[in-house]
């Protein structure tokens, strides 16, 4: 890059919050990343057993009503997985399916107190 080229664009960051049973965790979120990735990068215990491949419900989060309405309907596959999630509500979504944008600024994502991981051996994968 020469001195007259445009500088590389810095990804826009916003702030979101994760509400767990013990605390509310502020998190820096890069627009375009998934809520699951943001949770992992900020030390929030949101499982993501399938590593974001829409094959489980362990990254289930509960959204506030205004944000849920703004996002539009989940896919049929996501709906099916939400039906299997522990403590699912009318505003539940999967963190791996939510791409952060500016409309998420200051949003609160509630992390349920448990997940249903269908693994029978007790294995809990580490965040990637």
Swiss-Prot record:
Cellular localization per UniProt: Mitosome
Domain of life of the source: Eukaryota
Keyword terms, alphabetized: 2Fe-2S, Electron transport, Iron, Iron-sulfur, Metal-binding, Mitosome, Transport
Domain 2Fe-2S ferredoxin-type: 12-115
Transmembrane segments: none
Cofactor binding note of this UniProt entry: Binds 1 [2Fe-2S] cluster.
GO biological process assignments: P450-containing electron transport chain
Coarse class of the protein's main subcellular location: other
Gene Ontology MF: a single term: 2 iron, 2 sulfur cluster binding
Residues binding [2Fe-2S] cluster: 50, 56, 59, 96
Cofactor: [2Fe-2S] cluster
Gene3D superfamilies: 3.10.20.30
InterPro entries: 2Fe-2S_ferredoxin-like_sf, 2Fe-2S_ferredoxin-type, Adrenodoxin-like, Beta-grasp_dom_sf
Record-level GO cellular component terms: mitochondrion; mitosome
Record bears the keyword Iron: yes
Family classification: Belongs to the adrenodoxin/putidaredoxin family.
Summary of the function given for this chain in its UniProt record: Ferredoxins are iron-sulfur proteins that transfer electrons in a wide variety of metabolic reactions.
Name of the protein in its database record: Adrenodoxin homolog
Organism of provenance: Encephalitozoon cuniculi (strain GB-M1) (Microsporidian parasite)
């Amino acid at each position: 890059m020469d001195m007259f080229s445009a500088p590389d664009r810095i990804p826009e960051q916003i702030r979101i919050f994760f509400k767990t049973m013990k605390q509310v965790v502020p998190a820096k979120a890069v627009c375009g990343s998934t809520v699951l990735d943001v949770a992992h990068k900020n030390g929030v215990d949101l499982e993501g057993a399938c590593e974001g491949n829409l094959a489980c419900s362990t990254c289930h989060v509960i959204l506030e009503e205004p944000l849920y309405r703004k996002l539009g309907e989940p896919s049929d596959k996501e709906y099916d997985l939400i039906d299997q999630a522990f403590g699912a509500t009318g505003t539940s979504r999967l963190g791996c399916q939510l791409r952060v944008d500016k409309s998420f600024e200051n949003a609160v994502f509630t992390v349920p107190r448990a997940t249903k991981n269908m693994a029978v051996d007790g294995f809990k994968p580490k965040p990637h």
